[in-house]
């Protein structure tokens, strides 16, 4: 903390890589409005943010998954208070392919067959499309296991009790998945819809064969029609301190929620 009259209040905000762009945008805008408050934002994954709360070194953990019962228990044991949960917005996990891939839509089951350990889909021709640039082999891009995105995709797409098929390229962050997909004609990967570029295509996703396939967008995420959308959370230890609460309240205000939309996420459902 700075000395003298120009006292700066620091808020340590760590966690989800999915939320990193959003958290940085919030922090910058808040600093302009409140020059005496500095929100220090870092990534590292949802699990890292929660570990930071449990260890008492982080004020706010950003999470793209809900806190696990074991984590909540640890936080309570360490500090004697329950963690508080705030829903800050929604993230639509898009399924990305190369922009020249002729495939337009996919089902949850097909994704499980591509990414799951018992899955039998390994070639684009099995999905009824001519392989992009003659590259028929499907190149799977995934995330590391400390990522909330990895956990959520696994729970949603891969049959219960099963793991990811080995041999995927596991990327550090959301952005890297999209960047490598853009350079790899045979690639398929998953990442927040906010990371889309002109170099990739987002597939429509259907819950099951014969169902209507929906695009990843705000409307379909809020209605529940798009099957791979999830809440984005902030967690604090116990009730947040006044300066931390003021920040979270601002992030949830109409002004803060505009930032959510501007960074490609879905504003939090109205209470």
Where are these regions (language model features)?
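Exported/periplasmic ABC-transporter solute-binding proteins
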Residues: 1-91, 96-271
């Amino acid at each position: 903390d700075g000395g003298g009259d120009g006292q700066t209040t620091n808020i340590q905000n760590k966690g989800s890589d999915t939320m990193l762009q959003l958290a940085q945008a919030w922090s910058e805008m808040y600093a302009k409005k409140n020059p005496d408050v500095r929100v220090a934002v870092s990534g590292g994954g949802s699990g890292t943010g929660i570990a930071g709360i449990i260890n008492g070194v982080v004020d706010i953990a950003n999470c793209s998954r809900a806190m696990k019962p074991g984590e909540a228990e640890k936080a309570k044991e360490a500090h004697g208070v329950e963690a508080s949960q705030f829903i800050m917005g929604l993230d639509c996990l898009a399924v990305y392919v190369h922009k020249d891939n002729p495939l337009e839509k996919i089902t949850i089951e097909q994704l499980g067959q591509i990414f799951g350990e018992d899955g039998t889909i390994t070639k684009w021709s099995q999905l009824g499309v001519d392989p992009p640039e003659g590259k028929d082999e499907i190149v799977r891009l995934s995330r590391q296991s400390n990522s909330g995105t990895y956990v959520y995709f696994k729970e949603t797409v891969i049959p219960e009790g099963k793991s990811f098929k080995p041999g995927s390229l596991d990327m550090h962050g959301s952005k890297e998945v999209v960047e490598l997909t853009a350079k790899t004609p045979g690639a398929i990967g998953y990442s927040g819809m906010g990371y889309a570029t002109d170099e990739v295509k987002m597939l429509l996703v259907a819950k099951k064969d014969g169902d209507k396939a929906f695009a990843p967008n705000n409307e379909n995420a809020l209605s529940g029609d798009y099957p791979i959308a999830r809440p984005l959370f902030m967690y604090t230890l116990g009730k947040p301190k006044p300066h931390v609460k003021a920040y979270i309240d601002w992030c949830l205000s109409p002004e803060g929620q505009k930032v959510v939309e501007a960074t490609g996420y879905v504003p939090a459902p109205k209470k």
